[in-house]
Amino acid sequence: MSSYKYYDLIRKPIITEKTTTLSEQNKYAFYVDKFAKKLTLKKAIEEIFKVKVKKVNILNVKGKKKRFKGIIGTQINRKKAIVTLEKDHNIDFAGGIK
């Protein structure tokens, strides 16, 4: 699979208080494409970030029901991937920020 398709699999990293505490354990969270599989995500993370992936956990997040101007709607369903890296590897999301 070419590298540009790997960039389509990973939507965006999840940067919250909970995921920053997970990064201390070498675990990083991403929103990914809803058709992504564990093996292709592992290859994509390894090629894009040049790290060694130990394990990938995937979970589907159901969209919440929200109200807007009296009309009830739902947010989109998402797929979340929690990636565990090998011991000496890490991903720096804020590398160029000073």
UniProtKB/Swiss-Prot annotation:
Keywords: Ribonucleoprotein, Ribosomal protein, RNA-binding, rRNA-binding. GO terms for cellular component: ribonucleoprotein complex; ribosome. Gene3D superfamilies: 3.30.70.330. GO terms for biological process: translation. GO terms for molecular function: rRNA binding; structural constituent of ribosome. It comes from the Bacteria. Disulfide bonds: none annotated. Transmembrane segments: none annotated. It holds the Pfam family Ribosomal_L23. Part of the 50S ribosomal subunit. Contacts protein L29, and trigger factor when it is bound to the ribosome. One of the early assembly proteins it binds 23S rRNA. One of the proteins that surrounds the polypeptide exit tunnel on the outside of the ribosome. Forms the main docking site for trigger factor binding to the ribosome. Belongs to the universal ribosomal protein uL23 family. This is Large ribosomal subunit protein uL23. It comes from Rickettsia africae (strain ESF-5). The gene is rplW.
